[in-house]
Regions:
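Carbohydrate transferase catalytic cores enriched for Leloir-type hexosyltransferases
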Residues: 1-395
Length: 395
């Protein structure tokens, strides 16, 4: 097969992590098929060294312009690709010269971000996204939760959706932080105190306002107990400047001396933060998969996360689950994990076991099977009506 993969978002958080690790796993497992990585050659270096069967095809457009769409389509036609994998959800229908496999990470665009749009724009967005999903040769959902969302919101039959789980970036599997790593933490970031950790994107669904409020309540409880007087909350994530409400929450909660915003941290150091944290706190309101809790678990760090969306599916019995809308429930979970050492020891063991259940190689093997099934499938009338009508002449 000739397989194209759209890598134009390979440097982004989430989609980029997925794209890099899928390509790496495919390069380890597949020595038969030919792959064309369509996107920026400079960004492709983020993936690392690849065998000769993986070739980067330059396309600098970010995927949002008509010109970029035309160039993308022309590349697929010129290379005579058997299929293309687009590793993210998109909404503008595309008449491509070969079948496409699409990965859906979540439906956040339809659950939260559409609230600021008019009802007409929301309806159009929903309608066009449904057409795109119906036109896909196969849809890859990163969790059972995301699969059920696609079925319920768009009416796509479950038989056309394959659950293929995410996994941890291999750089988080290099063992515990060394004394030298912790020295860097102390010298470069001036961290010489116990801390709770949040790592991820900075956006309303991540529930950071309640994390800060729960931390403030926790400090008050710890003061009564005479425990952890120097405990801090560290928040790692970009785009803080777009969310001034977080700074206001810190000041209103009276913890301005105990909350630190560190912005972007490279993976090589992020693993040290995971390893050194007392607890990883992630009471997100909505996750299609939710990798950060799993990354923390790989280091044996206890996790407090949500009872909602995909998170119970991902963390299993290896985390403390809370109602993400209840600040005091979050606080009580944090307090319990901080003060009960036997529970911490039990959670650490479960964390290691849970993290091992997810593997990029296992996921890539299933993706390869899907590629073969889609490439071999006949173009049915139903598929043509769903968005492939213009392919009849080209195929």
């Amino acid at each position: 097969m000739k397989v194209a993969i759209d890598i134009r978002r390979v440097t982004e958080f989430g989609v980029g992590t997925y794209t890099r690790n899928v390509v790496r796993a495919l390069s380890r497992l597949d020595h038969t098929n030919q792959y064309f990585l369509i996107g920026s050659p400079q960004k492709a270096t983020e993936i690392g060294p690849l065998p000769p069967s993986f070739q980067t095809i330059a396309l600098l457009d970010d995927g949002t312009t008509a010109r970029g769409y035309i160039e993308f389509r022309a590349i697929l036609k010129r290379l005579q690709c058997d299929l293309v994998h687009i590793p993210h959800l998109f909404w503008m229908p595309r008449t491509l010269p070969c079948p496409y496999v699409m990965t859906v990470h979540d439906l956040l665009e339809h659950m939260y971000r559409t609230r600021t749009r008019s009802s007409l724009r929301r309806s159009l967005h929903l309608h066009l996204t449904r057409r795109v999903l119906k036109g896909a040769g196969r849809i890859l959902a990163v969790s059972k939760f995301t699969k059920s969302e696609i079925e319920n919101v768009f009416g796509i039959p479950g038989s056309r959706i394959e659950v293929v789980y995410n996994a941890i970036d291999e750089r988080f599997l290099h063992g515990h932080a060394t004394d030298a790593d912790r020295q860097v933490l102390a010298e470069r970031y001036l961290i010489k105190y116990p801390f709770l950790l949040y790592a991820g994107s900075i956006s309303p669904p991540k529930n950071l306002v309640r994390i800060i409020e729960a931390f403030s309540a926790l400090k008050a409880e710890l003061e009564k107990e005479g425990k952890f007087p120097d405990l801090k909350l560290i928040i790692i994530g970009d785009e803080l400047s777009k969310h001034p409400d977080l700074r206001r929450t810190v000041i209103r909660s009276g913890v301005q001396n105990d909350v630190r915003f560190l912005g972007f941290i490279p993976i090589e150091m992020l693993r040290v933060f995971y390893d050194a944290a007392k607890i990883f706190v992630f009471p997100s309101l909505y996750e299609g998969f939710g990798l950060p809790p799993l990354e923390a678990m790989a280091h044996g760090t206890p996790v407090v996360t949500s009872t909602t969306s995909s998170l119970p599916e991902v963390v299993g019995n290896a985390a403390v689950l809370v109602n993400p809308e209840n600040v005091f429930e979050i606080m009580r979970a944090l307090l319990h994990l901080l003060l009960d050492q036997p529970v911490r020891d039990q959670m650490k063991k479960r964390c290691y076991e849970q993290a091992k259940k997810f593997s990029w190689d296992v996921s890539a093997r299933r993706i390869l099977e899907v590629y073969a099934e889609v490439a071999a499938a006949p173009r049915t009338p139903a598929r043509l009506q769903a968005g492939e009508t213009t392919r009849r002449v080209e195929t």
